[in-house]
C-alpha cells in the first residue's frame, strides 16, 4: 500500500499562523500536545487513515480520558474532529497514536490545503489519572 505522508511538526507552524486554535467549552489544551499527523492510503480510495501523534508530558499517567483532536485552517475554519478512545491509557511522558478513518470533505480539505495551513489541538474535557485523581475541565 502506497503511503501519502503529511507528517508535520505543529510547533513549527502554529507559532507563525494567522489564527491560534483554542479548545472550547472549558476544555484543556495543556494535557496532550499534538506532535504530528499523517494520511495513509487504504484499499478504498475514497478513504484514508489518519495517524495523529500525541504526547503526554505530565508526571502521572492517564488511565481514562475524554478528549478530541480538532483541526482548523489558519484562517479559523473548522476542518474536522477526531475523538480519542476513552479507555486508551497514556503513560506519563509517553506518546500516543490515534488512528481514525477519514473520508469526505474532511479528507478533501486535508489533502487540498497546504500542510502549513492546517493547525490542530488536542482538547481534553475530563480525565482520570493513574493514581485515581479525576480532573474535569467543564467545571
Question: How does the language model describe each region?
Answer:
Residues 61-68, 78-83:
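Short, hydrophobic/aromatic beta-strand segments
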Residues 5-15:
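Bacterial N-terminal signal peptides
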Residues 73-77, 131-133:
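Solvent-exposed strand-loop boundary residues in beta-sheet-rich modules
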Residues 54-56, 71, 102, 127:
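Hydrophobic beta-strand positions in extracellular immunoglobulin-like domains
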Residues 56-61, 75:
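Short, acidic/polar linear motifs in exposed loop/turn regions
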Residues 99-139:
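Terminal connector regions
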Residues 20-53, 57:
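Low-complexity, acidic Ser/Thr/Pro/Gly-rich terminal tails and inter-domain linkers that flank the onset
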Residues 77-113:
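Intrinsically disordered, low-complexity Pro/Gly/Ser/Thr-rich segments with frequent PxxP/GP/PP motifs
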